[in-house]
């Protein structure tokens, strides 16, 4: 194809991690699907990723190098010079930053501007910290915001401090958006917010391609564990796990055998090491779980590979996304690809991914409605498969690898001036 593209990534793609470790990489992420497609097109790629490791090559056309991992909300001016050097050496036709929620994105914007390459740079909007910060603590009572554990005291951390960090990341994000000429987005929400910050932006629409395993497989009611709810995260407040726990307690009044499964480590562990590692939000979830008598109803699944995650989707009766803010959550797309019935809070860009015929959208921060809709899916029994099938049809269109690759290459050609 004769095009040189520089990628700036928040995390190393699985192929890079595998090259660094010398072992097959089990934790392949969604970016690997795009990377594989681009490598097959003969694009010369330079991948800069946040992390550690020795610079190297995946093949003659694809090289990689680490970017020092420092706090996401503190700008590092020295990165600008490092990026200017990268731009001088590689001379990319296109610069693509996958996300703008880390400080290194602004450093690349500034480096590209000083090198006269800003018109050839595009940034994909993943989440928008400047908007997420506003909803970080939605649904949390005052007593939860005041909780601080030993770990929080030692690290000078708290839920409110985490919200402040998101706001600071958002300030850097806004600076990047104000300077950029081009962004890639995929929802009505990210388009409206990006253009509100910088009306002069050229907004390019391009959906995301998800991890390969989720394109194969079909949810079946007969094969699932009845009344089992699957959620994707309990790690921080914006994912809304506190709301889902409250909803679960209501669901169990009608379905006493209802359970909730979630990836990650248990916040219910009572050993000393676990208690010392616990942050304020986890501590609140612990007390909430005990208060609602849900200790035996919540299952923690630990770290899951893509294949393991897929298995959990297929074993569940419903996928629930209770987040207080999202743009286009990949976990929802994965559930839809498999045809799993979904209930999601109607926040951010979620409605651009799933309509009411393809799933159930709830009002944000409404535990009563969340519980009602989960019960509705349970009551549908095998009839819920029709809704799941509609979701699958929609997701196969949204996350179509061939169509998304074509759109991305068209954007690259436009920016590079190599449209023919």
Where are these regions (language model features)?
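N-terminal subdomain of nucleotide-sugar transferases
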Residues: 1-54, 62, 116-117
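Membrane-proximal helix-turn-helix segments that form the acceptor-binding/catalytic region
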Residues: 33-34, 129, 145-182, 192, ...
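Short alpha-helical donor nucleotide-sugar binding micro-motif in glycosyltransferases
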Residues: 87, 311-316
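Short hydrophobic beta-strand element within catalytic cores of glycosyltransferases
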Residues: 341-344
């Amino acid at each position: 194809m004769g095009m040189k593209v520089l990628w700036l990534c928040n995390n190393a793609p699985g192929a890079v991690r595998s090259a660094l470790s010398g072992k097959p990489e089990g934790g392949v992420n969604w970016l690997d699907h795009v990377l594989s497609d681009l490598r097959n097109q003969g694009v010369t790629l330079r991948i800069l990723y946040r992390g550690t490791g020795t610079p190297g090559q995946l093949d003659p056309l694809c090289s990689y190098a680490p970017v020092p991992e420092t706090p996401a909300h503190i700008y590092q001016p020295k990165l600008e010079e490092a990026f200017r050097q990268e731009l001088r050496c590689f001379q990319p036709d296109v610069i693509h930053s996958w996300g703008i929620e880390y400080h290194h994105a602004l450093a690349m914007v500034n480096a590209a501007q000083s090198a006269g390459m800003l018109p050839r740079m595009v940034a994909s909007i993943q989440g928008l910290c400047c908007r997420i910060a506003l909803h970080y603590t939605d649904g949390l009572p005052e007593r939860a915001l005041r909780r601080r554990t030993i770990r929080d005291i030692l690290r000078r951390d708290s839920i409110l401090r985490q919200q402040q960090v998101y706001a600071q990341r958002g300030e850097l994000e806004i600076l990047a958006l104000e300077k950029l000429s081009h962004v890639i987005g995929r929802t009505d929400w990210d388009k409206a917010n990006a253009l509100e910050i910088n009306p002069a932006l050229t907004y390019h629409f391009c959906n995301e391609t998800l991890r390969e395993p989720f394109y194969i497989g079909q949810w079946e009611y007969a094969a699932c564990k009845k009344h089992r709810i699957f959620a994707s995260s309990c790690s921080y407040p914006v994912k809304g796990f506190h709301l889902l726990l409250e909803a679960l307690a209501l669901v169990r009044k009608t379905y006493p055998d209802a359970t909730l499964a979630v990836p990650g480590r248990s916040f219910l562990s009572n050993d000393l090491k676990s208690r010392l590692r616990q942050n304020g939000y986890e501590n609140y979830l612990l007390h909430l779980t005990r208060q609602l008598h849900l200790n035996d109803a919540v299952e923690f699944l630990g770290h899951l590979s893509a294949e393991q995650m897929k298995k959990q989707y297929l074993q569940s009766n419903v996928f629930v996304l209770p987040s207080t803010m999202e743009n286009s959550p990949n976990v929802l797309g994965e559930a839809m690809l498999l045809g799993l019935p979904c209930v999601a809070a109607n926040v951010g860009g979620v409605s651009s991914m799933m309509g009411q015929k393809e799933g159930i959208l709830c009002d944000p921060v409404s535990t009563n409605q969340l519980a009602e809709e989960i019960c509705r899916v349970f009551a549908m029994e095998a009839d819920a498969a029709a809704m799941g099938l509609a979701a699958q049809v929609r997701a196969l269109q949204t996350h179509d690898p061939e169509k998304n690759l074509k759109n991305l290459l068209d954007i690259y050609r436009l920016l590079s001036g190599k449209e023919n």
